[in-house]
C-alpha cells in the first residue's frame, strides 16, 4: 500500500490508461500511432535520440491522457496533506488563529461600506469625525490583516515544506537502483521541485482563498437580501455563480495545455542537464552547435505548446472581466434607479456598489486560485506517483541486523564468508514477456568465498561479473537461489547493515562536487584527520593532494570532472580504505592507472585485502595472480575456476587471455575487420 492511502495513484492511473487504450482503439487512433512509429524507424540511427522519439509520439494518445484530472485523486491528495499541517500544538493554535482572522476580516469588510454610507448621508450638514477615524482604522486593518495572517502561517508552511522535501529525498534514496537507471535526473529534479512547491501551495489556497471567498459570498448576499432587497442579492449571487461556473469550465479545459507544457519543459531540461554533464565529450566531438540545435528545437517545442496555454489564459481573463463588468453595472444601475425614485440615499447607492465591487475582488482571486489549484494538482501528480512507487528491493518485516560478533567473545569480530548458491538472474523488464525470453545474465552459478580469502572474476564484457557485485549489495533480488553471508540469507537482513560491511571501488568513480577531503571522508564520516591522511597515503593519492594549492580542500568539480581518471580512482580507493570494511569489492580498481602507479596501488590493495573477504573484477590479469581462486565467467556460467597457476596449466580461456596480455606492445598486430588484437 502506498503512503497516500489504500488505493494508490498507480492503480488510478492504470485504470485511466486502460480506458484511454480502449478509446484509442475504437477511434482508430492506433493506426496513426503506428504510422508515427514508422517515422521513428526511418530516422538514421546516429540521430536517434530519446527526445526525437518522444517528440514523434502520437499526439492523439498524449491528448487522450491529458483530457481530465482525477478528482478522486485530488481528494486523496488534500487528505494526505493534512498531517503535514495539523500536527503540533503551536501550529494548531496558529491555524485556528488564522481562521479566526478570516472571519474577523469578513466582519470588517461588511462594516467599512456601512460606515462610509453613514459618512456620505450626513454630508453636507455636518462631518462625523469619529466615523471618519473609525473608517480609517478599519480600512488600515482591512489592508494589513492578510499580511498578519501570512506572517503567522509562515512557520506552518516552512515546517510542511521541510517535511515534504525530506520525505521525498528519503524516498528517492529508498527506491531501487533499477528505478534510477531508467529515469533522467533532470526530469526527477523538476518533478520534485514543482511537486513540492505545489503541495505547500494547495492547502494555503484552499484555506486562505477559496474558503474566505465562500464565507464572504454568503455574508454579503445575506446582508443585501435583508437590507436592500432580493433583487440585489439575486444579482450578486447570479453574477458570482456564472463567474464560478465559467471559470471552472474554461480552466478544466486549459489544464491539458499546462500538462503538455510541463512535459515539453521536462524534455528541454533533460537535454540541458545531459549536455552540461557531458561537457567534456561535447568538446571532444566539437558538438556545441549540434547540442545548441537540439536544445533550440526542444525550447521551440515548449514555447509553441506554452503559447496555447497563454491564449487560453487570455480568453479566461477576458470572460471573467466581462462577467464582473456586467454584474457591477446591473447592480449599480438598479441602485441608481431606486435612488432616482427616492427609495435610496446616495449613501445606499455607494454602499451597494462597494459591496458588489468588494465581492468581485475576492472572486477575481477565486479564478486565479482555482487555476493555481489545478496547476498544483497537475504538478503534484508526478510527485505523488513518485512517492507511491515502491522499491523493487525492500527489507522484509522481520529483517535483522548482520552481526559478526563471536558468541563466545562478543568483543571479537568474525570475518564473513560469502556463498552464492544456485543463482540465476535476469535484469528486470517492464515487459514481462520480454523478460521471460531474455537470456539469463547468470544461470545457476554457485561459488563460495571463505572468510578472509579473495576471489577474482574474469571474463568478457557482459559475462555477469558486475552483476554479481550488484546482487551481493542487494541492488537487485535474485530470480533463483540465495546469497549467504556467514550462513544468513541477505534477504533476511537489513540492507543498511548489509551495505555497511561492504567497501566498493567501482570501475567508473563518480565523486560529489565537493572537496577531496569530503569525498574521501565519505567512507567514514567519523574518521579523524590522521586516519584520512593515512588512507590517502595508502591509496597513493596523498602526494597529489599535498601538491595542490588547496590541499584536502581542493574542489573536485561536478562528478569529479576536475580530476583525471586515475586520480578519481585513487580517491575511491582511499574512501574504501577509510571505511575499513570486512568485505571488499574491487571492480577494476586499477583500470584508470598508469603501469607505475598501478604497481603501487596493487601493493596497497594486497596489503589492505589481508584479513578481509575480497572479490575482484579484473581485465588486467596481472592484478589478480595473488587471489586464492579465480572464476572465469562466460555466458552466465562459470566455465573455469582455480588458482592462477592451475588455470595456466589448464590451458583454457584464462590461459589464452593471459598469453594475449603478456605479448609485448611491439608484437601486437591489429587484424582488420576483427574486434580483437592478435
UniProtKB/Swiss-Prot annotation:
Residues 95-375 form the ABC transmembrane type-1 domain. Belongs to the ABC transporter superfamily. ABCB family. Heavy Metal importer (TC 3.A.1.210) subfamily. The chain crosses the membrane at residues 95-115, 128-148, 206-226, 230-250, 314-334, 346-366. This is ABC transporter B family member 6. SMART domains: AAA (SM00382). The gene is abcB6. It is a multi-pass membrane protein. GO terms for molecular function: ABC-type transporter activity; ATP binding; ATP hydrolysis activity; ATPase-coupled transmembrane transporter activity. GO terms for cellular component: membrane. It comes from the Eukaryota. ATP binds at residues 427, 459-470. The keyword Oxidoreductase does not apply. GO terms for biological process: transmembrane transport. Keywords: ATP-binding, Membrane, Nucleotide-binding, Transmembrane, Transmembrane helix, Transport. Residues 418-660 form the ABC transporter domain. It is found in: Membrane. CDD domains: ABC_6TM_ATM1_ABCB7_HMT1_ABCB6. Its main location: membrane.
Amino acid at each position: 500500500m502506498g503512503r497516500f492511502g489504500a488505493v494508490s495513484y498507480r492503480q488510478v492511473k492504470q485504470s485511466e490508461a486502460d480506458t484511454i487504450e480502449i478509446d484509442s482503439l475504437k477511434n482508430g487512433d492506433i493506426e496513426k500511432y503506428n504510422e508515427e512509429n514508422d517515422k521513428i524507424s526511418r530516422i538514421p540511427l546516429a540521430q536517434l535520440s530519446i527526445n526525437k522519439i518522444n517528440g514523434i509520439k502520437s499526439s492523439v494518445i498524449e491528448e487522450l491522457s491529458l483530457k481530465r484530472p482525477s478528482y478522486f485523486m485530488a481528494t486523496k491528495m488534500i487528505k494526505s496533506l493534512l498531517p503535514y499541517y495539523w500536527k503540533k500544538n503551536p501550529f494548531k493554535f496558529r491555524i485556528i488563529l488564522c481562521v479566526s482572522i478570516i472571519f474577523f476580516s469578513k466582519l470588517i469588510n461588511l462594516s467599512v461600506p456601512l460606515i462610509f454610507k453613514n459618512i456620505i448621508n450626513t454630508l453636507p450638514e455636518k462631518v462625523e469625525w469619529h466615523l471618519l477615524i473609525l473608517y480609517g482604522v478599519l480600512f488600515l486593518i482591512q489592508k494589513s490583516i492578510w499580511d498578519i495572517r501570512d506572517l503567522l502561517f509562515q512557520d506552518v508552511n516552512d515546517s510542511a515544506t521541510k517535511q515534504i522535501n525530506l520525505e521525498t529525498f528519503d524516498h528517492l534514496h529508498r527506491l531501487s537502483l533499477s528505478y534510477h537507471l531508467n529515469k533522467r535526473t533532470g526530469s526527477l529534479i523538476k518533478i520534485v521541485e514543482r511537486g513540492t512547491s505545489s503541495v505547500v501551495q494547495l492547502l494555503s489556497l484552499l484555506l486562505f482563498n477559496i474558503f474566505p471567498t465562500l464565507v464572504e459570498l454568503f455574508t454579503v448576499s445575506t446582508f443585501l437580501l435583508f437590507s436592500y432587497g432580493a433583487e440585489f442579492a439575486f444579482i450578486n449571487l447570479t453574477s458570482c455563480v456564472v463567474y464560478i461556473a465559467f471559470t471552472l469550465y474554461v480552466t478544466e479545459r486549459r489544464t491539458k495545455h499546462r500538462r503538455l507544457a510541463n512535459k515539453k519543459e521536462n524534455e528541454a531540461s533533460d537535454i540541458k542537464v545531459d549536455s552540461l554533464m557531458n561537457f567534456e565529450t561535447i568538446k571532444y566531438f566539437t558538438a556545441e552547435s549540434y547540442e545548441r540545435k537540439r536544445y533550440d528545437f526542444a525550447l521551440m517545442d515548449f514555447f509553441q505548446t506554452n503559447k496555447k496555454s497563454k491564449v487560453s489564459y487570455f480568453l479566461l481573463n477576458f470572460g471573467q472581466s466581462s462577467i464582473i463588468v456586467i454584474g457591477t453595472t446591473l447592480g449599480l444601475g438598479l441602485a441608481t434607479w431606486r435612488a432616482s425614485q427616492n427609495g435610496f440615499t446616495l449613501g445606499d447607492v455607494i454602499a451597494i456598489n462597494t459591496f458588489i465591487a468588494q465581492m468581485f475582488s475576492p472572486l477575481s482571486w477565486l479564478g486565479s486560485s482555482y487555476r493555481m489549484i489545478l496547476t498544483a494538482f497537475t504538478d503534484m501528480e508526478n510527485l505523488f506517483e513518485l512517492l507511491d512507487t515502491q522499491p523493487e528491493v525492500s527489507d522484509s518485516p522481520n529483517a535483522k541486523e548482520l552481526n559478526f560478533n563471536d558468541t563466545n567473545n562478543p568483543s571479537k569480530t568474525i570475518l564473513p564468508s560469502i556463498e552464492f548458491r544456485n543463482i540465476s538472474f535476469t535484469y528486470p523488464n517492464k515487459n514481462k514477456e520480454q523478460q521471460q525470453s531474455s537470456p539469463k545474465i547468470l544461470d545457476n552459478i554457485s561459488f563460495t568465498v571463505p572468510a578472509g580469502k579473495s576471489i577474482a572474476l574474469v571474463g568478457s564484457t557482459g559475462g555477469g561479473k558486475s552483476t554479481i557485485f550488484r546482487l551481493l549489495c542487494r541492488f537487485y533480488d535474485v530470480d533463483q537461489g540465495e546469497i549467504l553471508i556467514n550462513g544468513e540469507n541477505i534477504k533476511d537482513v537489513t540492507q543498511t547493515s548489509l551495505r555497511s560491511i561492504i567497501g566498493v571501488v567501482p570501475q567508473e568513480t563518480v565523486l560529489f562536487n565537493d572537496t577531496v577531503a569530503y569525498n574521501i571522508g565519505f567512507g567514514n564520516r567519523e574518521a579523524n584527520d590522521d586516519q584520512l591522511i593515512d588512507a590517502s597515503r595508502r591509496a597513493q593519492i596523498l602526494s597529489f593532494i599535498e601538491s595542490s594549492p588547496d590541499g584536502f580542500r581542493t574542489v573536485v568539480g561536478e562528478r569529479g570532472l576536475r580530476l583525471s581518471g586515475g586520480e578519481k580512482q585513487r580517491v575511491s580507493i582511499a574512501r574504501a580504505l577509510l571505511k575499513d570494511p570486512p568485505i571488499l569489492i574491487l571492480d577494476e580498481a586499477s583500470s584508470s592507472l598508469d603501469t607505475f602507479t598501478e604497481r603501487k596501488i596493487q601493493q596497497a590493495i594486497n596489503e589492505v585485502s589481508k584479513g578481509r573477504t575480497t572479490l575482484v573484477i579484473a581485465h588486467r590479469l596481472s592484478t589478480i595472480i595473488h587471489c586464492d581462486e579465480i572464476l572465469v565467467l562466460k555466458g552466465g556460467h562459470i566455465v573455469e575456476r582455480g588458482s592462477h597457476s592451475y588455470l595456466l596449466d589448464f590451458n583454457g580461456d584464462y590461459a589464452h587471455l593471459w598469453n594475449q596480455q603478456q605479448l609485448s606492445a611491439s608484437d601486437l598486430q591489429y587484424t582488420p575487420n576483427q574486434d580483437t588484437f592478435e
